[in-house]
Amino acid sequence: GGRAHDIARGYAVKRQAFGKPLIDHEGVGFMLADNLIDLKQSELMIDWCAGVLDSGAPGIIESSMTKVAVSEALWRIADRCVQVMGGTGVSGDTVVEQIFREIRAFRIYDGPTEVHKWSLAKAIGRAHPGDVP
């Protein structure tokens, strides 16, 4: 996700549209800002989950939450990068197209997003008031 963002950012800074750099168009700038937010949230989720696992806790719920949050965020980031870059984003001219294609599978590996959400929903239903779920 970070590599695709860096490439899209560089493209948006250099590419001109309607007399100004793409980055100066609000829609493009907002997409790149959303990427930064998703990247930081993903980093924090991974660090949090790693801390839970390092403490010796099973981390089943935390792992599912992190897997869903990060894989969905990476998909959004890759999608925005393709959008920012237009046709170049889906061409072989940069690795953004490859990243976009490969990141899609992250939502399936180790259980699809929907299976993890189903598992989380069951945990929420079983939880007692004050418990984590």
Regions found by a protein language model. Give the residues of each.
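Alpha-helical interface subdomain recognition
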Residues: G1-P133
